[in-house]
Amino acid sequence: MNVSKIKSTEWLVVAGGVLVVIFGLLRWFSWEIDNSGVVIKGKTNAFDYLLTGVVPWLLVGGAALVTVLLASGTIARSRVPWPLVILAATVLGAVLILIRVIISDDPDTTGNVDVDVSRGIGLWLSAVGSIIAAAGAFLTYQANSFDSRTSNPGAAPRPDREIPPTTS
């Protein structure tokens, strides 16, 4: 596999995907429940949250994998609009992880207990990685859509509308 074919914008998708895959395994939340001197501690990672943990982990990690496979030529660039698919996957993954950052974690408790919940390093770096991947996917999509408009090397870009010929 020749990684020299990977563009710099695609490297952003790959790096962001690697961050999400690695830091999805680490601590996303830690919590401590104190009930009259009895303390219970726990921690969670991406796999404790299906919609806002596992799904974005698969989306962003899969987008990074597809990006590498496309650049290496393992997957053929067919009629599938891969830059758009990768953009959609990374943006959806980033939105879902950011939702998890916002809504936090709420351990089930009843009665008069003290609950302390804190976000872990895994959640923060997964959020950063998903944003990096989404930014790289957006830049790759922009570059590919510009390249498709100017596909003839050496020729002028195609106009957005037809200009009628002038008669002299």
For each predicted feature, which ranges?
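Compact integral membrane and secretory-pathway proteins
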Residues: 1-168
